[in-house]
Amino acid sequence: MTLADKPVLSHAVKKLLTNQYIDYVRVIINRNHEDFYRETIDSLHNYYLSEAVHSFQYVTLKSRKKEEWIPVSSTGMKGRVDTKLLSPVYGGKSRQNSVKLGLESLQKINPDFVVIHDACRPFVSNTLINNLARSMINNQHTGVVPAIEVEDTISLVNDDLIESTIPRERLRAIQTPQIFNFKELLSYHRSNKEFTDDSSLMVEHKKRVVVTRGEKINFKLTTKEDINMAKLLLDEPKYRVGTGYDIHRFIKAQGKAKSFIKICGVEIEYDMKIEAHSDGDVAIHAVVDAILGALGCGDIGAHFPPSFPEWKDRNSSHFLDFAAKKAKEKGYSVSNLDITIVCEEPKISPYKVAMKKFISKTLEIDSEFVNVKATTTEKLGSIGRNEGILAHASVLLYKIAPLHN
């Protein structure tokens, strides 16, 4: 299962890998899922991990004094995957057995504290992790767990009939991540008693487990309703907005032959030429930048550097095709596009219909969703002196099914 096109597990693991108090992360996986785990590690950026059947992972913290609350790395997690992300460990037949196997695997590291988190809680926040870690490090508790107050009425039900109502003032819903003294938790797991979570195991052995405030957003994906709620919260936005801008200088045309400039893919006869590395279509360049900006994919210069000879005199429709393909690959299509062309000459109005037709055909959208406007600067500035031409573009993209090869 994925959220925002990424495995559920990846969201929680990323938070743990980037947290300042976490020294190591180890994921417990089903032995039949190792290939999927490895493939995901190799293929995804930012060290996202693939989903595992046993939906939890371990992180360890070394003891730190109060004045030593400093990040593990000031550069973040990038480049540290080999040292911070440990190799996965196979789980057992039950959650508790998998926890025990994970704890056993950490003996060589011998951390002071261990954090156990359900990966099916993708909304764990750095604030929550930090609060738990500080409480544990500062007070040397045996265990610290997050919990939220129970706000609904709680009743005992038998055969769909309410038998009694339970006072809720002292009731709490326990969440993860949960932090414990590593050696004590491991020793109690070796007793092989069955418990629903690790805090229950510690309490059974008369150990004090401190409760701190949890977060409602840190809910567990258990039912279909939970999953639908998570998708609403975490899936990519349905719409994206981008803007683009481009400007080019006019230069004198050489010779007596007719000269043309190209705007929105349409040739316009004019006694000047556009100085540019490509064909100088300012409007298309602005549109390309708007689409790339909406996608978070940089700008036209990053993909088609003017220093590269292969783009010399290149038809700008090639750049527009590229941007449209990028949008499809990321699962977006153009909802509507607004272009403003600013110049004193030539006159744009006679060509607007042809411009709309060219742009809409290239982007594979109806021409009614493309608007082309033209204006002047009332003789002000370099454009007013007819030294060049510029264009602005605004685009709205909407989410469609992503393109899979």
UniProtKB/Swiss-Prot annotation:
Keywords from the UniProt entry: Isoprene biosynthesis, Lyase, Metal-binding, Multifunctional enzyme, Nucleotidyltransferase, Transferase
Region ranges (2-C-methyl-D-erythritol 2,4-cyclodiphosphate synthase): 240-405
Organism: Wolbachia sp. subsp. Brugia malayi (strain TRS)
Job of this protein: Bifunctional enzyme that catalyzes the formation of 4-diphosphocytidyl-2-C-methyl-D-erythritol from CTP and 2-C-methyl-D-erythritol 4-phosphate (MEP) (IspD), and catalyzes the conversion of 4-diphosphocytidyl-2-C-methyl-D-erythritol 2-phosphate (CDP-ME2P) to 2-C-methyl-D-erythritol 2,4-cyclodiphosphate (ME-CPP) with a corresponding release of cytidine 5-monophosphate (CMP) (IspF).
Pfam families per the UniProt record, alphabetical: IspD, YgbB
Ranges for region 2-C-methyl-D-erythritol 4-phosphate cytidylyltransferase: 1-240
GO MF annotation: an example: metal ion binding
Official protein name in the record: Bifunctional enzyme IspD/IspF
Pathway: Isoprenoid biosynthesis; isopentenyl diphosphate biosynthesis via DXP pathway; isopentenyl diphosphate from 1-deoxy-D-xylulose 5-phosphate: step 2/6; Isoprenoid biosynthesis; isopentenyl diphosphate biosynthesis via DXP pathway; isopentenyl diphosphate from 1-deoxy-D-xylulose 5-phosphate: step 4/6
PANTHER family in UniProt: 2-C-METHYL-D-ERYTHRITOL 2,4-CYCLODIPHOSPHATE SYNTHASE, CHLOROPLASTIC
EC number: 2.7.7.60, 4.6.1.12
Cofactor: a divalent metal cation
Family: In the N-terminal section; belongs to the IspD/TarI cytidylyltransferase family. IspD subfamily.
Binding site residues for a divalent metal cation: 246, 248, 285
Name of the encoding gene: ispDF
The reaction(s) this protein catalyses: 2-C-methyl-D-erythritol 4-phosphate + CTP + H(+) = 4-CDP-2-C-methyl-D-erythritol + diphosphate; 4-CDP-2-C-methyl-D-erythritol 2-phosphate = 2-C-methyl-D-erythritol 2,4-cyclic diphosphate + CMP
Residues given in the record as 4-CDP-2-C-methyl-D-erythritol 2-phosphate binding sites: 246-248, 277-278, 299-301, 375-378, 385
Disulfide bonds: none
Record-marked site positions (Transition state stabilizer): 277, 376
HAMAP family: IspDF (MF_01520), IspF (MF_00107)
UniProt GO BP: isopentenyl diphosphate biosynthetic process, methylerythritol 4-phosphate pathway; terpenoid biosynthetic process
PROSITE patterns hit by this protein: ISPF (PS01350)
Positions marked as site (Positions MEP for the nucleophilic attack): 168, 220
Presence of keyword Mitochondrion: no
